[in-house]
């Protein structure tokens, strides 16, 4: 299936002992693609994980910490959390929160406490929820934490003032590349056509505003806000913008480093 909507998937607590985050999870080949939901005033404890994390809020405000830097993040700002970086994401008291949450598949979506060592094997969502519901709690691995707090530089990237910004006059793209995943914001004029015959990376595109005609390997759909388009490596896809402006979407792509790591695990 190449077309998705988050409401078609069951929600799960991803790390219930450390976070109130409830999310549907779409599992690709190289990444986990999720929509985190948090009630006003709730969020996560300080934690980390061995995989890279990309965040883009679509509703509400995040009281966000990455490393030592704290920001109030609203829709229109992208947050990059490098692998092993200490972080915390909490919904402000203003209202409930939703944000796109994408992790690479070198680890699961389950996080680790700030002072916890990295275990030999990551827990699955089902495993951490069973342990949490039992009241016993997880068994921590022996050793020192590998959390990174210092030297992370600026992880916050302004993309839009708000999701309601007026349309721009031309085609605009803003791209941020991490080690394993890349984030691309795109705004296109009506009628814009974007085609790739042999897609070099896995991609998930989330529609923010406007409408487009999408075709992935012969499967077609008219897409609008909240629709997700999954394109596998080597796939063919086209996106044609409709007449309703602005047409905006965000795309997460796998990077060569990640592809090499995951592909070598399969061998």
PLM regions and their residue ranges:
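A short, N-terminal "cap"/entry segment at the start of jelly-roll beta-barrel domains
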Residues: 1-30, 114-180, 264-267
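Conserved short histidine dyad/triad with adjacent acidic residue
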Residues: 16-19, 34-48, 165-171, 184-199
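Structural motif
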Residues: 54, 61-63, 86, 96, ...
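Short acidic-glycine-tyrosine-enriched beta hairpin
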Residues: 68-83, 218-234
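Ligand-binding loop in jelly-roll beta-barrel domains
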Residues: 75-77, 83-110, 233-259
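Short, conserved beta-strand element in jelly-roll/cupin
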Residues: 35-39, 48-66, 102-104, 186-189, ...
């Amino acid at each position: 299936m190449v077309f998705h909507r988050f409401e078609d998937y069951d929600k799960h607590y991803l790390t219930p002992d450390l976070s109130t985050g409830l999310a549907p999870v779409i599992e690709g080949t190289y990444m986990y693609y999720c929509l985190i939901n948090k009630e006003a005033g709730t969020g996560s404890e300080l934690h980390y994980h061995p995989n890279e994390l990309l965040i883009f809020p679509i509703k509400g405000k995040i009281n966000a910490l990455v490393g030592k830097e704290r920001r109030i993040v609203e829709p229109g700002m992208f947050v990059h959390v490098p692998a092993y970086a200490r972080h915390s994401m909490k919904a402000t008291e203003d209202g409930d929160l939703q944000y796109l949450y994408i992790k690479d598949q070198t680890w699961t979506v389950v996080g680790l406490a700030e002072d916890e060592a990295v275990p030999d094997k990551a827990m699955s969502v089902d495993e951490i929820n069973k342990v949490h519901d039992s009241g016993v709690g997880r068994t921590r691995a022996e050793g020192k934490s590998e959390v990174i707090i210092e030297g992370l530089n600026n992880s916050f990237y302004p993309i839009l003032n708000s999701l309601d910004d007026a349309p721009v006059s031309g085609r605009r793209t803003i791209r941020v590349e991490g080690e394993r995943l890349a984030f691309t914001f795109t705004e296109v004029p009506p009628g814009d056509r974007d085609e790739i015959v042999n897609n070099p990376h896995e991609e998930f595109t989330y529609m923010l505003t406007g409408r487009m005609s999408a075709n992935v390997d012969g499967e077609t759909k008219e897409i609008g806000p909240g629709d997700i388009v999954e394109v596998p490596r080597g796939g063919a896809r086209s996106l044609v913008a409709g007449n309703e402006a602005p047409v905006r979407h965000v795309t997460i792509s796998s990077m060569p480093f990640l592809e090499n790591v995951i592909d070598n695990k399969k061998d």
